[in-house]
């Protein structure tokens, strides 16, 4: 009887250890997923500090080929952006909206109107091909909505997921 009780305890311990081992990877994945964008360099509670540049999304403009998210060209009249490779996140931000807020000193280029604007991510600004790591490449419509002058070329902003 003592041998049977010892065997039962050993089996129970082995089962408990196996269950604990099987549960560990899912906890690790959940922990990584939960902190995904907040662990990125430069992220603050108010969003990601970035440099906003002007990009043409229409065929034949300086933006290059069709948008990475849908394979289409877009009107420069749309509130749309391309994000640097890390922020584009392999397409996970495709068709999602972000909120763009010019920094106070960044508003010099055109005075500034609205404090923030929401735009849709449609493309990647490829950091492996010359785009800097902190770029929000936006349509002229985004600049107009913020009351900024596109001739200034770039302006400091903060952006966040909506």
UniProtKB/Swiss-Prot annotation:
Keyword Glycoprotein attached: no
Keyword Secreted belongs to the record: yes
Matches recorded under Pfam families: KWL1 (PF24300)
Residues in the signal sequence: 1-30
InterPro entries for this protein: Kiwellin-like, RlpA-like_sf
GO CC, any one term: extracellular region
UniProt entry keywords in alphabetical sequence: Secreted, Signal
Subcellular location(s) per record: Secreted
Protein name per its UniProtKB record: Putative ripening-related protein 7
